[in-house]
Amino acid sequence: MQKNILVLGAGAWGTALALQLAYRGHNVRINSWKAEHNEQMLKDNNNHKYLPSIEKFPSRLKAIQDWQANIIEFDSILVATPSSGFKNTILELKECILPQQNIISATKGFCHDSYALLSEIAEDILPTTKFALLTGPSFAKELANQLPTAVVVASKDINYARYVQELFSNENFRCYTTTDIIGAQVGGAVKNVLAITAGIAAGMEFGVNAHAALITRGLAEIKKLGLKLGANSETFIGLSCLGDLLLTCSDNQSRNRRFGLYLGQGMTIQQALKEVNNVVEGYFTAKAVYNFAKKHNVEMPLVFATYRILYEAADPRDIVKELMTRQLKNEN
């Protein structure tokens, strides 16, 4: 099945997914919210700003400027903006989306103003539009270079999830499906916060024992929040949670981990953000998850500790001491 796909968001991840769709045989148009970035992609037929390893776009992938005026051309819209821009993008789509069109989200995080799940935002604004989430352990550069990658497509509508699965999957990119859109979102969002925590620990040279403990207890915190919201327990040992958590906490391709690493090495927050020189989702998501967990009365010690380091200037060494000397308890 050949489809016409609009990709909104031309960062590394949005571009990698646009490339995957083009390699799959679809006609793809990609848009950046920055006019000068669109002009560069149109002129050079690449996105060297975010994916310098890709010399030229394949023939089926091109940049587009005025996507609203051309919305009728597309079957599906892939939203790959930072979480901070997700709500505004959905509001823009509300003004022009057609009844037969559907949305795929590749954005991870929570809504920055209401701390709601992104699927809730989409359903509230576009209640009759089919919505799916694509998430899992996937670095953009590796996907763009067609290295083997596996992800999850989550939707309340299993038939729509299967449609998206077929849209993307080929010999390099394998999509699984699930109807647990809550669990998939919680895993994909919270892991970015924990990747910062892992980076801080690495920067302070706390060792691999601490790294293993952090991932394991971090997974327990994600699961606790997810179950409170109605997620399925099995989701948390799958690609959208454990898989993504392992990847993001363990490799310096992760912007979130690198940001934490710089903090652990003594940089200020502003210095670390400047050094990463790209969106650090976990920095913004930490505040959202903190407020979200407090709202739902869910205790998340590692997430709360990371929030205090990022937003209350807490000393990481003091935080570690507090975490290690909390009241002793049963693991489960």
UniProtKB/Swiss-Prot annotation:
Catalyzed reactions per annotation: sn-glycerol 3-phosphate + NAD(+) = dihydroxyacetone phosphate + NADH + H(+); sn-glycerol 3-phosphate + NADP(+) = dihydroxyacetone phosphate + NADPH + H(+)
Cited HAMAP family: NAD_Glyc3P_dehydrog
Residues the entry annotates as binding sn-glycerol 3-phosphate: 108, 136, 138, 191, 244, 254-256
Lineage: Bacteria, Pseudomonadati, Pseudomonadota, Gammaproteobacteria, Thiotrichales
Record protein name field: Glycerol-3-phosphate dehydrogenase [NAD(P)+]
Cysteines paired by S-S bonds: none
EC numbers on record: 1.1.1.94
GO cellular component: cytosol
Gene expressing this chain: gpsA
Main location per the UniProt record: cytoplasm
Superkingdom of origin: Bacteria
GO annotation (BP), single: carbohydrate metabolic process
Protein family (similarity comment): Belongs to the NAD-dependent glycerol-3-phosphate dehydrogenase family.
Organism: Francisella tularensis subsp. holarctica (strain LVS)
NCBIfam families for this protein: PRK00094.1-2 (NF000940), PRK00094.1-4 (NF000942)
Compartment(s) of residence: Cytoplasm
Keywords: Cytoplasm, Lipid biosynthesis, Lipid metabolism, NAD, NADP, Nucleotide-binding, Oxidoreductase, Phospholipid biosynthesis, Phospholipid metabolism
Chain residues that bind NADPH: 13, 34, 108, 140, 255, 279, 281
